[in-house]
Amino acid sequence: MGQIFSRSASPIPRPPRGLAAHHWLNFLQAAYRLEPGPSSYDFHQLKKFLKIALETPARICPINYSLLASLLPKGYPGRVNEILHILIQTQAQIPSRPAPPPPSSPTHDPPDSDPQIPPPYVEPTAPQVLPVMHPHGAPPNHRPWQMKDLQAIKQEVSQAAPGSPQFMQTIRLAVQQFDPTAKDLQDLLQYLCSSLVASLHHQQLDSLISEAETRGITGYNPLAGPLRVQANNPQQQGLRREYQQLWLAAFAALPGSAKDPSWASILQGLEEPYHAFVERLNIALDNGLPEGTPKDPILRSLAYSNANKECQKLLQARGHTNSPLGDMLRACQTWTPKDKTKVLVVQPKKPPPNQPCFRCGKAGHWSRDCTQPRPPPGPCPLCQDPTHWKRDCPRLKPTIPEPEPEEDALLLDLPADIPHPKNLHRGGGLTSPPTLQQVLPNQDPASILPVIPLDPARRPVIKAQVDTQTSHPKTIEALLDTGADMTVLPIALFSSNTPLKNTSVLGAGGQTQDHFKLTSLPVLIRLPFRTTPIVLTSCLVDTKNNWAIIGRDALQQCQGVLYLPEAKRPPVILPIQAPAVLGLEHLPRPPEISQFPLNQNASRPCNTWSGRPWRQAISNPTPGQGITQYSQLKRPMEPGDSSTTCGPLTL
C-alpha cells in the first residue's frame, strides 16, 4: 500500500492542522509500535481521519481515544483502528462508580459501606504522553547529523520555544533515532537555538554533570576523563544515555520565550467558535510554556478573559468564569455566531389612482411610473430653449464631420498632352504647369511635372520596394526626406556577402565613423507613384537597422512636385501644424543621435527665401527625353522683402 518508513525517514511527519504537537506524537508513537511498521498510506489515512474528528465537539483535552474509536467508520482503510487500539490500552483509565442497586425492601438491603472512609487512590496505568520509541522497536545506532536532518528538526520546532512540550518531544525523538554523541548534541544546540539560549543551556548542563559525577554513575571512571569524553566512546552506551538525559534535562531551566504572539493578544473573534478559540490558546501555551509549568490555570483564565462578549455573558450567567475547561466548553457549545437574517419586505400593491398624472395628464398610473420624461424646470442656460435639459443641449454635442469622398490618385508618371493646366483639388490653389508645345506624332511626347501626393495621416512615410541585387526584393516603409543628400537603407536588406566600405557621415547628431557603410552595387527602388524603378549607383547602409530614408538622390530622378492635400482637420505633428509643403526645415528637431547624412548648405530656413513669385527656369533638358525641369531660385532676403511664404519644392 505504501513505502515502509525506515530509520532514515524524517524525524516527525507533519501533523494535521489544529492538532497539538504532543497529541500527534502519541499517534505517531502508537503507529511505530505496529508490526510490521506503518506505511505512508497508513499515515495518510490517519491524518484524513483526524481532520474529520477535529470538526466534532469532542475535542476536549485530554483526547478520549475510546470516543475517537467509536467515530471510526466500519471498514475504514489503513491501520487506523490498530493505532487507536494501542492508544486505548495505554491511556489512563478513570475508575467509574458502580451502578446503584435496584430499589428493594429495606429488610433485604445490604449494609452500606462507611461513608466517612474515602475510596482508595487508583494510580494511572500510563502517562498522558507516550514514551518515545524508535520505529519498529529496533535499537538505535549512532548516525552523524546531515543537513537535511537538521533542517527537518528545525522546521518542526520553529514555532515552539526551547523547553516547551513540542520542542522536547521533537528533540527526544531525534536523540532516540540518531543516538548522538556529546559533540553532535552541541552542534544541534547551536543550530537550533540562539547564542543566549545555548549559553544558559551550557551553564545548566555543567551543573548537572557536576552533580552526576559527584553522585556517581554506573560505568563512569573519573580517571578516564570527564563525562563528555567518555560519552563519545561507542563502547560506553550507558554513559552516552546518561549524558543524553542530562543534556535534555538542562532545557528545564530555560525561560520560556514563545515565538507566537503573546497569550494576552490571542482574542476570540466575533464569529469564531469557542472551541476553536480555546484550541488556539492551548497550542500557544504548549509552544511557549517550559516543560513542567502548570498550564491549566493560565488556560482557564485566558479562556474567559479573552473570549468575546457573547461567550463571556454565557460563562458569567452559568457561573463558569473559572471552572474546569470541560464545563466552559459545554457551556459555550450551543452558542453560534448571530447571522444577520435578511428579510424581504414586500410592499403591498395599491390600486391605481383615479386622478390624472400631473406629468402627462393621463389617469391609471402613478407619477413615478410615468413614461413621459420629466420636463426641465426652466430654459437651457446655454441656448435658452425651454424644451430640453442642459445635458441634452445640441451645443454640447460635438459635430460629426461628414465623411470625405475618396480622392483619385493625382500622380501618374505618364506624359500629359492636355493644353490647359490641371487643377489640384484642395491643394492650396496650386496648378500644374501647362505643356509649352504641341505633341508631334514622330516625337516623344513631353510630360508635365508629375505630382507626388502624400497621405496626410502618414506623411512623410511611404512604402517602397527595394531590390539590392544580392537578395530578393523586400517592401519597407521609408521616410521621404528632402534634406538628406543620399538614400539610407537598413543593412537587413542586404546579404552577408555584399561588399561594403567604411565612410564618415556628418549628420544632425554630429560626425559618425562606424554607424553607416557605403555600398558600390546598384540598388533598384520602386516607389508607389512611379512606374519605372529608380536606379541608385550607391547608397548608405545603416548598420544598426534604425533608418530607411529616401533622399534627394532618389527624388531627383522622379522629377516631381510634393503635393500634400489639405484635409478639413489637418493632422498635428507634435506642437506644430503640418505645413502644406514638406521639407527638413518644417520637421521637429532631430534627436541627438546619428541618423542620416545632412548637407547643411542644401537646406535653409524658409524665411531666407525670397517672397517674390516663383521664377521659372529652363535648364539643361535631359538628353533623349525632352523632359523640362523646373526649379526654384533662391537668394538671400532683401531689405524690401517682407513676405515669408514658401512655394512647392521642385526637385
Curated annotation (Swiss-Prot):
GO cellular component term of the entry, any: viral nucleocapsid
GO molecular function per UniProt: aspartic-type endopeptidase activity; nucleic acid binding; structural molecule activity; zinc ion binding
Disordered: region residues: 93-144
Keywords, ordered alphabetically: Aspartyl protease, Capsid protein, Eukaryotic host gene expression shutoff by virus, Eukaryotic host translation shutoff by virus, Host gene expression shutoff by virus, Host-virus interaction, Hydrolase, Lipoprotein, Metal-binding, Myristate, Phosphoprotein, Protease, Repeat, Viral nucleoprotein, Virion, Zinc, Zinc-finger
Zinc finger (CCHC-type): 355-372, 378-395
Record flagged with keyword rRNA processing: no
Lipid positions (N-myristoyl glycine): G2
Stated consequence of mutating M486I: Almost no effect on protease activity
Motif PTAP/PSAP motif per record, residues: 124-127
SMART domains per UniProt: ZnF_C2HC
Example GO biological process: symbiont-mediated suppression of host gene expression
Site (Cleavage): L130, P131, L344, V345, L449, P450, L574, P575, L582, G583
Gene3D superfamilies: 1.10.1200.30, Acid Proteases (2.40.70.10), Delta-retroviral matrix (1.10.185.10), Human Immunodeficiency Virus Type 1 Capsid Protein (1.10.375.10), Zinc finger, CCHC-type (4.10.60.10)
EC number assigned by the record: 3.4.23.-
PANTHER family reported in the protein's UniProt record: ENDOGENOUS RETROVIRUS GROUP K MEMBER 24 GAG POLYPROTEIN-RELATED, IGE-BINDING PROTEIN
Note: HTLV-1 lineages are divided in four clades, A (Cosmopolitan), B (Central African group), C (Melanesian group) and D (New Central African group).
Name by which UniProt lists this protein: Gag-Pro polyprotein
Species this chain originates from: Human T-cell leukemia virus 1 (strain Japan ATK-1 subtype A)
Gene: gag-pro
